[in-house]
Amino acid sequence: MDQFELPEALFRIGLIENLELRIEVPNYTTVDTPGDNVDGFSDGSIGVKVHLADQNGALPDLGLIASASLPVGKEAFSSDNVDPTLTLAWAYDLDSGYSIGGNVGVTSSDGGGDDRFLETAYSFAAGIPLTESWSAYVEYYGLSFLSSDEDSEHYMNGGFTYLVNNNLQLDWRIGFGLTDNSDDLFTGAGLSVRF
């Protein structure tokens, strides 16, 4: 199976100090399998992120993200319901520009079926400075389905970021699945712009 998604766009808009609005644009997705091709838009989402605490001693920088999917996608790529998500994100700056971070979140979803289940997502990443403009990262993340028969999915990925200027960053990533039901290989490129 081959899958392609575009644009993977997330708009982050500062509302007031320590509060941002987050709007995820639906992706146009194509899935090619032997004998069948499906394409169309996925669901989008809307949410907010609240900054809870700055890094202080052993305490990391903390943020809480509350969001909900918007069921606007094609049937093959939509749950046809509003699926709420709550995520705790953390980051910790180490010496010499190194950093670690991660998140843990839970989503209530029906996966397009009749019964709702809880899906947890979790990640841990390390950031590595290479030059003033170039950085690298490596990340582990996973998905577990608490009240569903689906098996957990686990992934590793890494990539590079290039800071063109203070308002523009380019990135590239590549990763692979660690479990049988995970995607074998994936890659992507991105562009971050600050207005």
Where are these regions (language model features)?
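Transmembrane beta-barrel domains of Gram-negative outer membranes and organellar outer membranes
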Residues: 1-195
